[in-house]
Design a protein with these regions (language model features):
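Conserved small/polar residues in nucleotide/adenosyl-binding loops
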Residues: 205-211
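Structural microenvironment flanking redox-active thiols in thiol-disulfide oxidoreductases
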Residues: 88-148
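Short loop/turn microsegments at loop-to-beta-strand junctions
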Residues: 48-49, 71, 171-173
Length: 215
């Protein structure tokens, strides 16, 4: 009887997996789920949908290249003179923090692809000294980018989820995605404190999840 009790206690202890310090997000209203990683595999159904666009080097960039990586995404345009320079400066801080880590990536999507062709993105990358080894600037179909931003990345939260692609997309949000394509954070890309929190979250997520992903 005593042995059975000890076995039951052991099994109970093994079943109690720790709750993640970094929340999971499943809906565009960004309700946080502080659950264990094991529970998230069954509870969190939302994943970033597959995508493919051209980067600043004129190469086709496919989301499958992000498999097994933690990445940070934002939405900018090269002619933006208000929030985009600040957002790029803060993204540079993230790039610097993980410049030697091949399991962390940054992705910036242009929201004015009719202006921002690969040549424009290349000039932008040169201006801000962006390394294409871990930071990709992407352009492509406006409709594809806008749909991906609003319905996969929840870039404009609930208010923008069902907007038509004819409505201009402009957001300061930076979105953190884990190795399994799940959203783990949303930050104001113009605020240094938010950037610090994002860097901490990237570090935590990178170290605590296995590098198995379906993007």
């Amino acid at each position: 009887m005593k042995n059975c009790w000890l076995i039951s206690l052991f099994l109970l202890a093994c079943s109690e997996t720790p709750v993640s310090k970094i929340p999971y997000y499943n809906t565009p209203d960004f309700t946080p789920y502080f659950i264990s990683d094991a529970e998230a595999d069954f509870t969190i159904s939302h994943r970033i949908k597959p995508f493919s666009f051209f980067n600043q080097d004129s190469s086709l960039f496919e989301s499958k290249s992000l498999q097994g990586k933690v990445y940070v995404a934002n939405f900018i345009f090269t002619r933006c003179s208000n929030i985009c320079p600040d957002m790029t400066t803060q993204m540079k801080r993230i790039e610097k923090a993980f410049h030697s880590n091949s399991k962390v990536a940054l992705v910036s999507f242009t929201v004015t692809p009719w202006f921002d062709d690969v040549k424009s993105l290349h000039k932008f990358a040169d201006k801000y000294q962006i390394s294409s080894s871990n930071w990709s600037l992407l352009t492509g179909s406006k409709e594809s980018i806008y749909t991906l931003a609003r319905q996969s990345f929840f870039a404009e939260e609930s208010i923008g989820y069902n907007k038509d692609s004819k409505e201009f997309l402009h957001t300061e949000h930076v979105v953190l995605v884990d190795q399994k394509g799940r959203i783990r954070g949303i930050y104001n890309g113009t605020i240094p404190l938010d950037t610090e929190q994002c860097i901490e979250a990237v570090s935590y997520t990178h170290l605590t999840l296995p590098t198995i992903c379906s993007v």
